[in-house]
Design a protein with these regions (language model features):
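C-terminal interaction-tip segments
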Residues: 1-23, 33, 149-161
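Short beta-strand/loop motifs in extracellular/secreted proteins, especially
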Residues: 26, 36-40, 71-75, 154-156
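Noncatalytic modules at the cell exterior or secretory-pathway interfaces
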Residues: 26-28, 138-152
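Short edge beta-strand/loop segments characteristic of extracellular beta-sandwich folds
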Residues: 27-31, 65
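Short, surface-exposed beta-strand/strand-loop-strand elements in extracellular ectodomains
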Residues: 35-47, 116-122, 156-161
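Small/polar beta-strand repeat architecture
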Residues: 46-117
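Exposed aromatic-hydrophobic patches
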Residues: 63, 130-138
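Short proline/glycine- and polar residue-rich coil/turn motifs
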Residues: 93-95, 123-130
């Protein structure tokens, strides 16, 4: 194996597509501006859309046709309307077109976009920036890289090739 010289970077201040073509995630720099517990997700850029409902509890029911999930799977949910928190969740109570996740207590509903192929998740609970090098050739993202940043003051720089 020879050295790869064509490593590039992408900087994100909000959730979104960082790379829109096949790439390998090589490393990540996460820079929080405040000490708060959060999870940042890097996903293969393939999504499914649907709806969600949180009826005044901590149970969020997500409806996405033929989602293909199993109990215990981790998914990144981008709630595109309503007030639910965008982040990675563990799936439960799976049926063909629905599943549930546990959220902060709320009464809200709306639209959601799901990324079911999480390449890497990073947790942090202080205001210190940190870098993570992905070993070997990196993690393959066949359809590009979507970055899921929580609703806090944080930026990411990812390195890919």
């Amino acid at each position: 194996m020879t050295m790869q010289y064509d490593v590039k970077s992408a900087h994100n201040t909000v959730s979104g597509v960082a790379v829109n073509y096949r790439a390998r995630l090589k490393g990540v720099l996460i820079s929080p501006s405040t000490a708060v517990t959060y999870n940042t997700s890097f996903c293969n850029n393939v999504s499914l859309s649907g709806t969600y409902d949180v009826p005044g509890s901590t149970t969020c029911t997500v409806t996405i046709a033929n989602h293909g999930l199993s109990n215990g799977d981790r998914v990144y949910l981008n709630f595109t309307s309503g007030t639910a928190q965008d982040e990675a969740y563990t799936v439960a109570n799976v049926a063909t077109n629905t599943f549930t996740v546990t959220v902060a207590s709320a009464t809200t509903s709306g639209n959601v976009t799901m990324y079911a192929d999480i390449l890497a998740e990073f947790d942090c609970s202080n205001g210190t920036s940190f870098y993570t090098l992905i070993p070997g050739e990196g993690i393959l993202a066949p359809n590009g890289i979507y970055v899921g940043i929580p609703n806090v003051a944080i930026t990411t720089t990812l390195f890919y090739g």
